[in-house]
Amino acid sequence: MYWTKSKGTGGSVLKEENFVVEEIPSRKFFMKYSRLAGGIKEVQGPYTLALLRKKGITTKDAVKFIQMKFNLKKDGIGYAGLKDKFAVTTQYITIKGEIKDFKTDRIDLTKIGYTDKMMQVGELIGNKFTITLRNCKNPQNMAVMEEIKKRAMPNYFGPQRFGSHGDNHEVGRLILRNEYEKVLDLINKRGYNKNLDEISKKTLKFFIHAYQSFLFNKILDTYVSKYSKPSFEEFPLVGYDTKLKNDFASRQLKKVLEKDKISINNFSIRCLGLRCNGSSRSAFVKVGELNYKIEGNSIILTFTLPKGSYATTLLKEITKNVP
């Protein structure tokens, strides 16, 4: 199912260097001076601000490597967002303590200065992308680009959200239904051999978040199939604190939850000590600074997306490779 009506270009990302991501962090980490009661003073702080460039490694694995190299505590590094493994990515991190610049074949860390704030997840504005699509069947089909500029983009969660097996949401659904034997069957098929009490709360919550994302995508699917104008409302990411209304998103959510035999109260699981209160997410987002250049049967795309939005969703609309 596609939101745009124009024909796709085809094409694919063939290697990491064809998918470049630059994080746009919160400006507060770059303030060199601050206004205090005693006047304007230069910012000093216990945190080192550094630029992390990486390729072929996840943000979490890169952070673990840096922690080991500089003998840092587990919570000694802060970052705003997680970047994919199959990409060349740039992001800022904060480090409690001193570091030296270093470079490997996958990680390049450069010290920028100091800050008085520890970076937290979510403290970014968005991301800038430079993506090269190779072997495009119809590189001249640029009408789809103009359509996206005018009509915005459905803010689907990308496939990364659902794990390499594509079934993280199914594990989450089973957790919420208290079907713990089935949960263990699914998890242990991946090569593990664990009991439920050996799985961290963080991991269990991760599966529930995948189910929340699955529900959001289902609601958005229904909207895209019914309407031609984008909705710039927020759709629910359901949790125990979600207040269902008599609007489109709430009605669709009720239908899916009833089908899955799950209630709002299921998102608070006392026996596991898990509580997911829920939140909301923009149904559609504007694609910023979308530009393109055709080189033979390749297309070079540049654009920005707000935090939490997936470039893979945009690529699906442009290429129309996925039925």
Which ranges hold each PLM region?
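Extended, charged/glycine-rich binding lobes that contact polyanionic ligands
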Residues: 1-40, 47, 55-60, 65, ...
